[in-house]
């Protein structure tokens, strides 16, 4: 028995010493260098220069999600994710996406309970174009009756496809409704058909004017650019 105990103790000592040796040689992640700015229009800007590849990735975070929707207007944040691709003063329907694709880039968006995020990845020499397009749709989005009604039907169909017509599609909605009895997280991001049908163009315009403003947004740029030059471009647009 004593021999077994001695062997066990020795094994534990060896394991402990090995763990300490491993801990001392652990590779630590590189330091993340970035600059944080607040512009005069209260837009928050985060810049992280990375010259490893000749591309730039941009995300613009609007700090509005399903938790911020007015009562009886669930799905508005997600609806606006769609509306932001439907043209502005200087860009036609879906032109934002097609321009990014034409230079070899990608763009998309997603909506959560807390945020609506739009992202673009482009070759670095198209940074100026990308910033101009984001500024254009933030300031001059085309919010008209025809596009609103068309996109509302798209969102309703998306709900039918992803939730209503799936065997367990509404399970998460029931779980959230039980977990958050009063908190706005109980409202599904996709919204309800009834709320979407009840919405009006005036509701949509009010939502846009309230939340899609520089003071409610954070722009993140990471990639192959000169930090000072990128900062000047953002201030320009």
Residue ranges: model-predicted function:
Residues 1-11:
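Bacterial N-terminal signal peptides that target proteins for export
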Residues 9-14, 204:
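Extended hydrophobic/Leu-rich segments
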Residues 12, 32-33, 56, 173, ...:
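Hydrophobic alpha-helical context, especially transmembrane and signal-peptide helices
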Residues 16-18:
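N-terminal signal peptide c-region/cleavage motif recognized by signal peptidases
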Residues 21-97, 119-122, 128-135, 205-237:
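His/Glu-rich zincin catalytic helix
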Residues 88-89, 95-207, 236:
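Acidic/histidine-enriched segments that form metal/cofactor-coordinating
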């Amino acid at each position: 028995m004593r021999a077994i105990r001695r062997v066990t103790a020795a094994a534990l000592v060896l394991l402990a010493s090995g763990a300490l040796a491993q801990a001392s040689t652990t590779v630590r992640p590189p330091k993340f260098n970035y600059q944080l700015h607040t512009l005069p229009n209260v837009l928050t800007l985060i810049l992280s220069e990375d010259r490893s590849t000749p591309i730039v990735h941009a995300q613009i975070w609007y700090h509005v999600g399903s938790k911020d929707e007015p009562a009886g207007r669930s799905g508005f944040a997600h609806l606006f994710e769609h509306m932001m691709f439907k043209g502005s003063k200087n860009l036609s329907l879906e032109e934002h996406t097609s321009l990014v694709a034409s230079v070899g880039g990608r763009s998309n968006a997603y909506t959560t309970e807390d945020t609506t995020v739009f992202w673009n990845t482009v070759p670095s020499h198209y940074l100026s174009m990308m910033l101009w397009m984001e500024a254009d749709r933030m300031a001059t989005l085309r919010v008209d009756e025809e596009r609103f009604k068309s996109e509302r039907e798209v969102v309703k169909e998306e709900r039918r496809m992803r939730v209503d017509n799936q065997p367990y599609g509404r399970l998460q909605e029931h779980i959230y409704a039980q977990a958050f009895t009063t908190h706005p997280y109980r409202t599904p991001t996709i919204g309800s058909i009834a709320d979407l049908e009840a919405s009006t163009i005036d509701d949509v315009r009010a939502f846009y004017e309230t939340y899609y403003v520089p003071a409610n947004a954070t722009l993140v740029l990471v990639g192959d650019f000169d930090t000072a030059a990128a900062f000047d471009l953002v201030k320009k647009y």
